[in-house]
From Swiss-Prot:
Part of the 30S ribosomal subunit. It comes from Alkalilimnicola ehrlichii (strain ATCC BAA-1101 / DSM 17681 / MLHE-1). Belongs to the universal ribosomal protein uS10 family. Involved in the binding of tRNA to the ribosomes. The gene is rpsJ. GO terms for biological process: translation. Keywords: Ribonucleoprotein, Ribosomal protein. This is Small ribosomal subunit protein uS10.
Length: 103
């Protein structure tokens, strides 16, 4: 797999889970002999929701909620076959979304 690159993008609501998963991926890739760039923190997406808490009147009574989506980006340069196998067998936390692309 010479001159190839694997780009891994992680998404999660909890920053501790995403950092732990990124550490595991970096350790696995380095252990198998690949070079890693990252993890690069991408901007946090904040979604805010405003909900009326009164069922009928009192428009002033509202609650606001916020969901933060944390993202990390990593590039694995010149991965070996061992690297790909180790990444496929890696068991990450349940709250982390992983997207893998080959370039």
């Amino acid at each position: 797999m010479a001159n190839q690159r694997i780009r891994i993008r992680l998404k999660a609501f909890d920053h501790r889970l995403i950092d732990q998963s990124a550490r595991e991926i970096v350790e696995t890739a380095k252990r198998t002999g690949a070079h890693v760039k990252g993890p690069i923190p991408l901007p946090v997406k904040k979604e805010k929701f405003t909900i009326l808490i009164s069922p009928h009147v009192n428009k002033d009574a509202r609650d606001q909620y916020e969901i933060r989506t944390h993202k990390r980006l990593m590039d694995i340069i010149d991965p070996t076959d061992k690297t790909v196998d180790a990444l496929m067998k890696l068991d990450l936390a349940a709250g982390v979304d992983v997207q893998i692309k080959l370039y």
